[in-house]
From Swiss-Prot:
InterPro entries: Tctex-1-like_sf. Gene3D superfamilies: Tctex-1. Belongs to the TDA2 family. It comes from Saccharomyces cerevisiae (strain FostersB). Its main location: cytoplasm. Keywords: Cell projection, Cytoplasm. GO terms for cellular component: cell projection; cytoplasm. The lineage of its organism: Eukaryota, Fungi, Dikarya, Ascomycota, Saccharomycotina. This is Topoisomerase I damage affected protein 2. It is found in: Cytoplasm; Cell projection. CDD domains: DLC-like_TDA2.
Length: 124
């Protein structure tokens, strides 16, 4: 199944795009590696949002950050059986030279879940 992410306005990000991807992936990996977290009872998306926001705040306090995670259960979906539709729109009033948005798709083949992550930054 092919899920496409169309990027927003990330050219003015407080971090390079590669660093944002690494930050998201490392946050997710640390959740999976933490034996004290029971992911069957804890919300993976809420924990991921918390970790990503904590790391972003350490990089720059000049911005306010917003993180959103949409979780898709992709178990049993394939090219012939892709029977779901998802639409998510977001709007903001911002200064285009300082503020922006970054979208990223994170797939976990072991749990059959896909996370669509959106990060927004607004200059203070």
């Amino acid at each position: 199944m092919q899920i496409e992410i169309k990027d927003g306005r990330s050219d003015n990000s407080p971090l390079p795009e590669r660093k944002l991807v690494t930050l998201i992936q490392e946050s997710y990996d640390s959740l999976k590696b933490d034996n004290e977290i029971n992911l069957s009872t804890e919300s993976t998306s809420n924990l991921l949002i918390k970790l990503v926001l904590e790391k972003l705040e350490k990089h720059s306090s000049l911005y306010k950050y917003i993180a959103s995670v949409t979780t898709l259960n992709i178990e049993g979906l394939n090219e012939e059986n892709a029977n779901f539709s998802l639409k998510n729109d977001i709007g903001a009033s911002w200064e285009s030279k300082k503020d922006g948005i970054f979208n990223y798709k994170l797939e976990d083949k072991n749990s059959n879940e896909c996370y669509l992550i959106t990060i927004l930054w607004l200059h203070k």
